[in-house]
């Protein structure tokens, strides 16, 4: 596994333009690639949206297909403009899906039998993922018909769970090669078909080197097909944080209200800060299943006058909260289900706004946050450590800002969308040469 760090940094040498240059290979006929997702565009998946936009700018003939219907709420204007150019399935497509099964049964009965047998590998101890994979296998029959009709040359799934299951099955039916990206919840834990997908994919992209180490346990062959492709994020942001570091100190947390974010640990740390006499305001931007439990805990800890819940904040508006923040805290944990974050995009965004960061060493986070260099790392599920890190940042503003500036430089070098998405483009071109 010693090669993983080198793979992670292999495309960090030069910056290139996303625009096609006269006489370049971009002028050759573009390969036709299908992207398979659950939803698209999704307001919390700006990293996937940006990848699709930039790959199209590079000249890739890319078509998006979704297993489910439309998510129309909280979309930016740019997302809304692209929303119409998506082929969606969802429950209304069920009659077509059944017809597609009959179509492929007549053409490739042996492959259909193999896909049906694969259902025996689903692990119903994770019913959500297994249910998703069951739907994905059914949807794959209709997707395969569309891929065949549209002359698709490569299939890519943007998640390793149901999306990759659909891509794998459609690849089996059509003979079109497929790849997938492994990120976070989709592989922690992986679904019951992960070995099949790792075996048959021509390329496995991961967001972090930590994910390669995790998936290596399920891969039967060499790791040559693995490629660490860090997400690209817009490097130009509105409003650099002043980091005034004057009371009340502004602490910011952004993310979905789910267990792996560890926001309950941040609230307990906030209680410790209040008990220590620290004057602060804690802002939460996000929504989710744990909204009411978190609000209840806030009340129970007698923090209602210090903690503010903003609800879901669109990507276009979140810059104001970053610009006003003194400290950004992302207290990620490994959930009881083993779900965890890969490398939260909000950490990149906070550093781009020059906000000092406190977070935990979960999964791929240490690939960005080096303790004492680009931010502060603390143990997960340790409110005392979170509180101590916040007090350390408050006590030395200059050192905190210096860490944030080093972190910003690392984001710009490691997560440049032009460089990273060009690397992805080149990977696809190598898979289907023209």
Regions found by a protein language model. Give the residues of each.
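A conserved mid-protein helix/loop that constitutes part of the nucleotide-sugar donor-binding site
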Residues: 46, 249, 253-272, 278, ...
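Carbohydrate-associated surface elements
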Residues: 210, 232
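Nucleotide-activated donor-binding/catalytic signature segment of Leloir-type glycosyltransferases, i.e.
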Residues: 295-316
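Short alpha-helical donor nucleotide-sugar binding micro-motif in glycosyltransferases
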Residues: 312-313, 320-325
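Acidic donor-binding loop of glycosyltransferase active sites
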Residues: 323-338, 355
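A short, well-ordered alpha-helix in the C-terminal region of glycosyltransferases
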Residues: 385, 392, 399-414, 420-426
């Amino acid at each position: 596994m010693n090669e993983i760090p080198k793979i992670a940094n292999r495309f960090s040498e030069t910056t290139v333009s996303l625009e096609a240059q006269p006489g370049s290979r971009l002028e050759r006929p573009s390969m036709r690639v299908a992207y398979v997702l659950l939803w698209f565009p999704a307001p919390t998946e700006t990293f996937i949206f940006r990848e699709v936009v930039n790959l199209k700018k590079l000249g890739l003939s890319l078509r998006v297909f979704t297993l489910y219907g439309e998510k129309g709420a909280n979309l930016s204007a740019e997302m809304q403009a692209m929303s119409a150019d998506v082929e969606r399935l969802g429950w209304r497509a069920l009659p077509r899906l059944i017809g597609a099964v009959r179509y492929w049964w007549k053409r490739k009965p042996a492959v259909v039998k193999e896909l049906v047998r694969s259902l025996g590998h689903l692990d119903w101890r994770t019913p959500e993922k297994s249910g998703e994979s069951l739907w994905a296998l059914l949807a794959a029959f209709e997707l395969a018909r569309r891929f065949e009709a549209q002359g698709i040359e490569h299939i890519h799934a943007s998640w390793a769970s149901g999306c990759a299951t659909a891509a794998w099955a459609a690849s089996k039916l059509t003979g079109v090669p497929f790849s997938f990206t492994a990120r976070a919840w989709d592989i922690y834990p992986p679904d019951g078909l992960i070995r099949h997908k790792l075996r048959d994919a021509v390329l496995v992209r991961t967001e972090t080197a930590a994910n390669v180490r995790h998936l290596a346990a399920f891969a039967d062959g060499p790791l040559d097909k693995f490629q660490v492709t860090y997400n690209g994020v817009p490097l130009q942001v509105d409003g650099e944080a002043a980091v005034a570091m004057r009371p009340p100190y502004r602490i910011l947390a952004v993310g979905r209200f789910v267990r792996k974010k560890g926001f309950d640990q941040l609230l307990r740390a906030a209680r410790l800060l209040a008990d220590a006499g620290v004057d602060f305001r804690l802002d939460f931007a996000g929504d989710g299943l744990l909204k009411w439990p978190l609000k209840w805990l806030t009340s129970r800890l007698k923090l209602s006058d210090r903690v503010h819940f903003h609800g879901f904040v669109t990507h276009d508006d979140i810059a104001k909260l970053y610009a006003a923040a003194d400290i950004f805290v992302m207290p990620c944990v490994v959930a009881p289900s083993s779900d965890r974050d890969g490398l939260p995009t909000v950490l990149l965004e906070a550093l781009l706004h020059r906000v000092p960061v406190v977070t935990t060493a979960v999964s791929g986070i240490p690939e960005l946050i080096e303790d004492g260099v680009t931010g502060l790392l603390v143990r997960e599920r340790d409110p005392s450590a979170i509180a101590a890190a916040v007090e350390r940042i408050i006590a030395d503003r200059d050192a905190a800002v210096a860490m944030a500036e080093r972190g910003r430089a690392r984001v710009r070098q490691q997560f440049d969308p032009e460089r990273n998405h060009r690397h992805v483009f080149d990977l696809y071109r190598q898979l289907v040469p023209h």
